[in-house]
């Protein structure tokens, strides 16, 4: 571990359309090969589809979906005396948000709809209603932590 001071967190500018910083972070994670305009068009297209389908504020639906996917607890490997234990630990808020964003994008990419905007909107609507693969991933993570609760005293 470095003894130098911790680098300061990079400030992420809010997205131009809704002025939402989390949405901007989501776009940055969705972006491939530095093509931000493509990522923006996908996200904005998905939000438009969500608005027509759900008849509700798409940014609020996005935040609901993100909160439903956000994990509270996860397991981390810890080696103790030649054995590796899966130790449940609480997830820091920044990491929980990053994991939720990553899981939503992965789940959307694995869907079968034709366009990425359609896949993303379907996954976000599912997540907002506590369904879908991203929510399943969170449930699996919580289940793993619950199953390994006996090793929680190995926390560091």
UniProtKB/Swiss-Prot annotation:
Is tRNA-binding one of the keywords?
yes
Role summary: One of the primary rRNA binding proteins, it binds directly to 16S rRNA where it nucleates assembly of the head domain of the 30S subunit. Is located at the subunit interface close to the decoding center, probably blocks exit of the E-site tRNA.
**PANTHER family, per database record:** RIBOSOMAL PROTEIN S7
Can you say what this protein is called? Small ribosomal subunit protein uS7
Enumerate the SUPFAM superfamilies for this protein.
Ribosomal protein S7
What domain of life does the UniProt record list for this protein's source? Bacteria
One GO CC annotation:
small ribosomal subunit
Assembly information from the UniProt record: Part of the 30S ribosomal subunit. Contacts proteins S9 and S11.
Gene symbol here is rpsG
Q: Which NCBIfam families match?
A: rpsG_bact
Keyword tags? Ribonucleoprotein, Ribosomal protein, RNA-binding, rRNA-binding, tRNA-binding
Q: Which PROSITE patterns match?
A: RIBOSOMAL_S7 (PS00052)
Family assignment from sequence similarity: Belongs to the universal ribosomal protein uS7 family.
* Pfam families (alphabetical): Ribosomal_S7
> Organism source for this protein?
Novosphingobium aromaticivorans (strain ATCC 700278 / DSM 12444 / CCUG 56034 / CIP 105152 / NBRC 16084 / F199)
What biological processes does GO assign it?
translation
Q: Which GO terms describe its molecular function?
A: rRNA binding; structural constituent of ribosome; tRNA binding
């Amino acid at each position: 571990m470095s003894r130098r001071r911790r680098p300061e967190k990079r400030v992420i500018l809010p997205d131009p359309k809704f002025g939402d910083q989390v949405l901007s972070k989501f776009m940055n994670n969705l972006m491939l090969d530095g093509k931000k305009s493509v990522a923006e068009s996908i996200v904005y297209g998905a939000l438009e589809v969500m608005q027509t389908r759900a008849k509700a504020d798409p940014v609020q639906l996005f935040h609901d979906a993100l909160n439903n996917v956000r994990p509270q607890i996860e397991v981390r490997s810890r080696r103790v005396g030649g054995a590796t234990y899966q130790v449940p630990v609480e997830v820091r808020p920044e990491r929980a948000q990053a994991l939720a964003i990553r899981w939503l994008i992965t789940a959307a990419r694995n869907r079968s709809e034709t366009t990425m905007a359609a896949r993303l909107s379907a996954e976000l609507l599912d997540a907002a209603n506590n369904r879908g693969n991203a929510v399943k991933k969170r449930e699996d993570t919580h289940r793993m932590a619950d199953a390994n609760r006996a090793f929680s005293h190995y926390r560091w």
